[in-house]
């Protein structure tokens, strides 16, 4: 990859660049609120909560401009753009998949070269669909298969891991 042909990166939002999990646990601290179907219900109750979505703290700022954002959020894109602007992050197209168990690759394949996500299942589904994907290392995904893992949102690390993934999978 060179600067004449930049890597088109699809970047997940929650727990990739924003601290969704920390904000969620502050609002829903009970152990019973940490079960998947309860999380889905609680997130649905936050759909119109502008303050929640616009005030998520920044986990990590990428040192590149993503081509697109890919998320499974159900809130207004306006809230997302406002949060991006608040943290001086680039405003780029936002692709939202409303079904939590859906495959982001169905939405973004052909619109990017690689997906970066914190979810092992999102990364695995993308790869199984023929879309290169990298797992950003976060505390909640330490027990899973390493897949193609990166430790930071650094463009050089991403390029290296992307090229290694293509070579490993025979996609180059």
What are these regions (language model features)?
Residues 16, 23, 74, 121, ...:
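Conserved Rossmann-like nucleotide-cofactor binding loop
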Residues 90-112:
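Donor nucleotide-activated moiety binding/catalytic core segment of transferases
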Residues 12, 69-71, 116, 136:
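Short hydrophobic segments within beta-strands
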Residues 114-152:
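Acidic, Mg2+-coordinating phosphoryl-transfer loop and its flanking beta/alpha structural elements
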Residues 85, 109, 127:
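Anion (oxyanion) recognition and catalysis
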Residues 1-50:
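Active-site neighborhood of HAD-like aspartate-dependent phosphohydrolases
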Residues 2-8, 139-172:
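Charged phosphate-binding loop/patch that engages nucleotide di/tri-phosphates or the phosphate backbone
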